[in-house]
């Protein structure tokens, strides 16, 4: 008994772990897989409680019906669907005319909402599966960049050094082994010429596209599920009805009062009854679907703009170079080569994520550390670009700088100690 309880709690904890926010994404991604998914799942639980715990349908039956017959009528009408006829219209005599007016979606509302919540989470699961295939651990990099211990300057400097080394090793791994690891690019379609350094960034843009496609599919499913194909903009039409003063009696989208036909055998004879029923659950369902339609409209617009932003930021070489130059705060003819040959799109993507989560200061420090690695590997003097003077001027005054000049000089990550003289070896360029 105790073992089964532990197993159940383990599976529950594993399921809830998927609802935890990740660090290797942005706010728009969390709008999809965390906030929207959780909200739709709550709606599914709410409607389920109303249907299976409360009384979703109440029928007006003849006076001679007993309580058991009334319960049978309500259960039958709930399972076999009801149909809606405007009060000013006559009830059709033909049974097939009545069947064409049946409303059969309200029983499936909780299941449809649960599937919708799952669909909002699928792109995030695909991102988790594909983002770790390149050796560039974006989640680990952002966790280190965002840790609270970085408020200590010593810890921050050590963290920046670790981040720069990890990013450099991962980018070098991509340059050296990317051509031999072509199978990891099949799922994300990232064969962008000879630049295998665009794997993570291309997968991320692909996930953004999945989010946008999911919102569009949700619109199509909403109209198909509610059988409102003649109104492509379902929520807009319902709101238009409400603005004109047309309530549910006229529109028929979520009718509260419906009709139900059923037959009863009495002494070998079949008696047909037509009763009038109240679908209380439709009042709740109407509000949920109108809210979802409006929310999907806003979410689709936000996702489209966000996708356009990331496409420009990662696909445009000019945008990538401007981003790197802004955080280096310098002008150099080597920035283009540093961005396109050393960092490449994946490195710029990581720096943009660091700037978004840990702030521009941390991003500038990491960019500068990578710049120093690039200069050393290129065989250029490390201090010929005056990196330290432009950065220190933002956080310390001239008096502090003069006072520090009078103190014994300490090593820092800006000025690495010079190694003892060694024979000059040929320098191998990994990014040319």
Describe each region flagged by the PLM.
Residues 1-400, 405-408, 414-431:
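Membrane-embedded alpha-helical segments and the immediately adjacent membrane-proximal loops
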């Amino acid at each position: 008994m105790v073992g089964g309880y532990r197993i159940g709690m383990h599976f529950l904890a594993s399921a809830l772990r998927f609802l935890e926010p990740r660090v290797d994404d942005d706010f728009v991604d969390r709008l999809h897989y965390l906030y929207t998914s959780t909200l739709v799942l709550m709606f599914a639980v709410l409607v389920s409680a109303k249907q299976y715990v409360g009384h979703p349908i109440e029928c007006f039956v003849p006076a001679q019906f007993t309580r058991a017959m009334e319960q049978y009528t309500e259960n039958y009408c709930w399972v076999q669907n009801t149909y809606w006829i405007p009060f000013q219209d006559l009830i059709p005599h033909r049974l097939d005319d009545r069947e064409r007016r049946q409303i059969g979606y309200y029983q499936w509302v909780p299941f449809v909402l649960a599937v919708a919540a799952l669909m909002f989470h699928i792109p995030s699961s695909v991102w988790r599966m594909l983002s770790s295939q390149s050796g560039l651990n974006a989640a680990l990099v952002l966790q280190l960049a965002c840790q609270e211990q970085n408020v200590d300057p010593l810890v921050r400097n050590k963290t920046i050094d670790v981040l720069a080394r990890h990013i450099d090793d991962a980018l070098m791994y991509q340059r050296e082994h990317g051509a031999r690891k072509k199978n990891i690019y099949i799922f994300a379609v990232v064969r962008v010429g000879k630049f295998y350094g665009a794997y993570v960034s291309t997968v991320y843009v692909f996930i953004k596209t999945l989010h946008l496609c999911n919102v569009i599919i949700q619109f199509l499913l909403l109209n198909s599920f509610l059988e409102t194909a003649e109104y492509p903009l379902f929520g807009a039409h319902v709101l238009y009805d409400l603005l004109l003063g047309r309530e549910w009696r006229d529109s028929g989208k979520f009718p509260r009062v419906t009709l139900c036909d059923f037959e009863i055998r009495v002494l070998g004879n079949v008696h047909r009854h037509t009763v009038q029923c109240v679908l209380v659950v439709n009042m709740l369902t109407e509000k949920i679907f109108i809210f979802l339609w409006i929310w999907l409209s806003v979410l689709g617009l936000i996702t489209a703009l966000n996708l356009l932003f990331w496409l420009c930021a990662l696909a445009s070489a000019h945008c990538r170079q401007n981003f790197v130059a802004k955080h280096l705060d310098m002008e150099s003819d080597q920035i283009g080569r540093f961005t396109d040959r050393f960092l490449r799109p994946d490195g710029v993507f990581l720096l943009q994520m660091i700037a978004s989560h840990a702030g521009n200061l941390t991003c500038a420090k990491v960019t500068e550390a990578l710049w120093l690695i690039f200069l050393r590997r290129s065989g250029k003097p490390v201090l010929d670009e005056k990196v330290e003077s432009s950065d220190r001027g933002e956080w310390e005054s001239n008096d502090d700088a003069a006072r520090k000049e009078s103190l014994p000089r300490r090593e820092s990550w800006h000025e690495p100690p010079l190694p003892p003289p060694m024979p000059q070896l040929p320098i191998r360029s990994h990014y040319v």
